[in-house]
Structure formats: C-alpha cells, structure tokens
Amino acid sequence: MARIAGVNIPTNKRVTIGLRYIYGIGETKAEEICRRLEIPAERRVNELSDDEILKIRELIDSEYRVEGDLRREVAMNIKRLMDLGCYRGLRHRRGLPVRGQRTHTNARTRKGKAVAIAGKKKATR
C-alpha cells in the first residue's frame, strides 16, 4: 500500500482513482498529476515503482495544498467570515444554509434533525 500525503492509497485501484483518496485531489488533479509525470492512466497502484511513487509524493507536496493544510485553510476561511460578522459568517455561526437556499422547508442537512414542538397536541372535539 503506497502512502502519499499521509493517506494509504489502495493498491488494487488505478492510479487516477487511488489519488482521489487524498483530500484535495479530485478527478482533474489526479489526471493532471499522471499526465505531468507520464504515468499511464490505466496503470494500477501496485504496478508503480518506488521511484514513481516518490515522484508523485514530491509533486503533490510541492505544488498542491492537500489534507491537513487544506482542511486548516478552509476552517480558517470560515472562522474569518464568522469573526467579520458578515452575512455568510452569521449563517455559518447559526448553522443555516450559506448560499441563499430556502429554509422555511428543507435545509435539513445543515439544520439537523427536525424536532417536534412539545406541548402542541390535537384539540379534542
């Protein structure tokens, strides 16, 4: 199992698929890395030589922000918005949708599980 950027890459998958296990590397960046290092896209991770793994590791470390650094940057951006007190920061602070979605109905992912209103019972006739 190859270890790149602190992540164990599955050995039986293709290189472009395996690189996507790293936070911050998606389909496009994985294909770009393979193209720049001239690694065939259909090659499996277990078929890579130690030299190729080292080249991948060096390229990712030098040119891409991944894993811990990227997570920290995203968290700091959100914290900055909250400290500014701007609209987006307030929405983050309150746990509501940030990008203008409706909240009267829906938005359950961001707001959490719906809680029934206690004490509101059906009136008997």
Swiss-Prot record:
InterPro entries registered for this protein in UniProt: Rbsml_uS13_C, Ribosomal_uS13, Ribosomal_uS13-like_H2TH, Ribosomal_uS13_bac-type, Ribosomal_uS13_CS
UniProt similarity note: Belongs to the universal ribosomal protein uS13 family.
Gene of this entry: rpsM
GO biological process terms, semicolon-separated: translation
PANTHER family per the UniProt record, alphabetical: 30S RIBOSOMAL PROTEIN S13/40S RIBOSOMAL PROTEIN S18, SMALL RIBOSOMAL SUBUNIT PROTEIN US13M
Gene source species: Gluconacetobacter diazotrophicus (strain ATCC 49037 / DSM 5601 / CCUG 37298 / CIP 103539 / LMG 7603 / PAl5)
Subunit structure: Part of the 30S ribosomal subunit. Forms a loose heterodimer with protein S19. Forms two bridges to the 50S subunit in the 70S ribosome.
GO terms, molecular function: rRNA binding; structural constituent of ribosome; tRNA binding
Taxonomy, superkingdom: Bacteria
Name the record gives this protein: Small ribosomal subunit protein uS13
GO CC terms in record: cytosol; small ribosomal subunit
